[in-house]
Design a protein with these regions (language model features):
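Helix-terminus/linker motif at the lipid-water interface of multi-pass membrane proteins
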Residues: 1-6, 65-92, 98, 116-117, ...
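Short alpha-helical transmembrane segments in multi-pass integral membrane proteins
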Residues: 1-58, 114-179, 221-258
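Hydrophobic faces of transmembrane alpha-helices in multi-pass small-molecule transporters and flippases
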Residues: 23-26, 42-73, 77, 98, ...
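Transmembrane alpha-helical segments of integral membrane proteins
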Residues: 187-188, 213-222
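Small-residue-enriched core segments of transmembrane alpha-helices in multipass membrane transport
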Residues: 94-95, 174, 207-216
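Transmembrane alpha-helical core positions of polytopic small-molecule transporters
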Residues: 67-68, 104, 183-184, 211-214
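Small-residue-rich hydrophobic transmembrane alpha-helices
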Residues: 75, 88-152, 183-205
């Protein structure tokens, strides 16, 4: 069979997503503990529930969209610098996403526990869960930073054989390390706010952090200061750390009022 290249990669991704959905449907349908989750045929859409879901979901969607857009705009900036910086950016985004998903898993778990404690009015454990999740995230980040630092050459070489691209990726890794603290903070406390259903300000804080802080600084560092690809990535720690502190102070203020 003839190699399909990028088109084949797209087909493989589509198939994996379809199989994942099918697997989840089968698990929910067959396992007894998910019996209550099975939808009834007679169950129709409930307007008041739809409104509540939109009220909670839209700010979260906008917050996540703004964060993702800041990375996408940075990709455009890297493209202006040339194909080699753009390739390096894509490799770093892949490495960054892996680390993000690990920490995000802890944040998502914290969100579930926080919502349970909120439901029974146990605000002491709401606070403790958020703080514990943050420190677990920091511990995981330190482990990942150590592993990436030790194995950075073989890790980057898995993606490309181009020495030029490898060199640029290695120059971006310190920027990636710098923003891990802020990223962990914003992941943890954004999820904590979701757990207590306080999401309205998430999109405002995301707009401030990514649109007003991160993207302009990436441009200034890269093209006005002349730092190139490193400059693009140096804007990210400022945006993510700003988001982290804004989410943290919002969470703390909400907890104090309750």
């Amino acid at each position: 069979m003839e190699a399909l290249g990028l088109f084949g990669a797209g087909i493989a991704t589509l198939i994996s997503r379809i199989l994942a959905v099918m697997a989840l449907v089968v698990v929910i349908a067959k396992m007894k503990k998910y019996k209550e989750l099975k939808p009834s045929v007679s169950t129709g859409p409930e307007i008041h529930r739809m409104k509540h879901l939109l009220f909670l979901g839209l700010p979260i969607s906008i917050q996540l969209g703004l964060e993702a857009s800041s990375f996408n705009i940075c990709a455009i900036f890297m493209g202006w610098l040339g194909s080699i910086p753009l390739a390096a950016h894509q490799i770093m985004c892949t490495i960054s996403t892996l680390c993000f998903q690990i920490v995000y898993g802890i944040g998502a778990a914290a969100s579930v526990l926080i919502s349970q404690f909120r439901g029974v009015g146990d605000w002491h454990n709401v606070r403790r869960t958020a703080n514990t999740a943050f420190f677990i995230g920091i511990a995981l980040i330190l482990m990942m930073i150590g592993m990436i630092q030790i194995f950075r050459y073989p890790l980057v070489s898995c993606f490309t054989t181009s020495e030029e691209v490898v060199s640029v990726v290695l120059s971006l890794i310190p920027c990636f390390f710098i923003y891990q603290f802020g990223d962990c903070m914003q992941i943890t406390f954004a999820n904590a706010l979701r757990g207590i259903a306080e999401v309205k300000k998430l999109m405002l804080y995301a707009f401030i952090s990514y649109v007003i802080v991160s993207i302009p600084l990436s441009y200034v560092f890269a093209f006005i200061f002349g730092w190139g690809g490193v400059g693009v990535w140096m804007g990210m720690p400022f945006g993510l750390t700003t988001a982290g502190f804004l989410f943290y102070f919002e969470f703390r203020s909400k907890i104090k009022k309750l």
